[in-house]
Design a protein with these regions (language model features):
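Polysaccharide-binding surfaces and accessory modules of carbohydrate-active proteins
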Residues: 2-253
């Protein structure tokens, strides 16, 4: 059963942390709308997605399509959360650990004068053995849309910006179903849309931006990342909830 760990509100945005066993997930919703959160019929989305080279590839027929939800993620354990509040911002730091000595830090910052939040992910090897990461998310959001239950067909729109060097972004809007982002009848096979830019061009095919719109409830989750290297964003779905993550390109996409 999913329990509410903490809630924080600032700048018109509410962050809801929910815990299910060792998994802590983050929901970002408009302030005042948290009472409408209904989604609990999908897997809780971990705060951090990561993949170590020594760990097996993820299951669910997803090899070569995604590196999300690997055994690396399943080894993470929640150890605590702190919050520093001031008039202009709230900084929430969540700690996760791995039995191999890896310490993960997820930092969320809410701003009083900005409706957007900032998410930063860090990992430190506190053990004696070397490890190689081949995927680490900067952010990830799951259980989309948290205001729906079940499949909620034809209610999620995906917005992306196609572009290239010295060009304007061209908006492309597609239904989640048109991108095959819907679960199988058994909710086992994982479907993924992974896109981004390989190389130091920040815009090369796509702008580092993606938005998921819940047309049934009038809420949109939009994310952007800024990197001077290969980057990616990824839409993922294996059950009733959709997930959106992004950051550095993983080994498969950025190689």
């Amino acid at each position: 059963m999913r329990e509410i760990l903490n809630r924080y509100t600032l700048g018109g945005l509410t962050a809801v942390y929910r815990r299910e066993g060792d998994v802590v997930e983050l929901l970002l919703v408009p302030a005042g709308s948290e009472g409408g959160i209904a989604r609990a019929d999908c897997a809780a989305e971990p705060l951090i997605q990561a993949k170590l080279t020594e760990d097996d590839a993820p299951a669910s027929f997803s090899g070569g399509r995604t590196m999300r939800n690997s055994p690396t993620v399943k080894a993470m354990r929640y150890t605590g959360q702190t919050a520093q509040k001031s008039a202009d911002k709230t900084v929430v730091v969540t700690k996760l650990t791995d039995p191999r000595g890896l310490a993960y830090t997820h930092t969320l910052t809410l701003y009083a004068d900005n409706p957007a939040a900032e998410v930063v992910t860090r990992v430190e090897n506190t053990g004696s053995e070397a490890h190689t990461l081949e995927m680490l998310s900067s952010f990830t959001l799951g259980s989309l849309s948290p205001f729906s239950e079940g499949l909620a067909p034809e209610t999620l729109k995906i917005h992306r910006l196609r572009s290239t060097w010295s060009a304007e972004g061209r908006l492309v809007t597609e239904a989640a179903e048109d991108l095959q982002l819907e679960p199988s009848w058994k909710c086992y096979s994982a479907n993924s849309v992974r896109f981004g830019s390989v190389g130091s061009f920040p815009v090369r095919g796509f702008v580092p931006f993606c938005a998921v719109e819940d047309t049934a409830h009038g809420v949109t989750w939009a994310a952007a990342t800024t990197l001077g290297s290969s980057w990616q964003m990824e839409l993922y779905r294996s059950d009733m909830g959709l997930s959106l993550s992004g950051g550095l390109a993983d080994r498969e996409f950025g190689a």
